């Protein structure tokens, strides 16, 4: 079993990169997050691995808090109208492509403001496809992403 550590906190982006510890099967682990594309440097609070596209491998969602905590709601939403700002602090979705994780957050429909504190992966609507629920804090509404069964989600 491998271990993935979501490293939030008030540190610089370099110091809060998430950690992927790969089991070497001799009571040791090696850190390989960068190699696998999972060295997310946002303020991560939780992570889940699941097969969102039913291709037989595990994909990944890293739930993040916003870098813009403490701003009033109007300023916060103005800041997040800039896609670069938004992409740094949104929760991130990674597709497993041949053992390397690729950030496809915008492609799957999850590029939205996030202050995630709770994450649930389940078939919410009983259609056999896994959906995503993110419980956000402060003035960011919770998000219920229902699978469109085509590799994208709709926030309902």
Label each region the model flagged.
Residues 1-156:
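Acidic, glycine/proline-rich Ca2+-coordinating loop motifs
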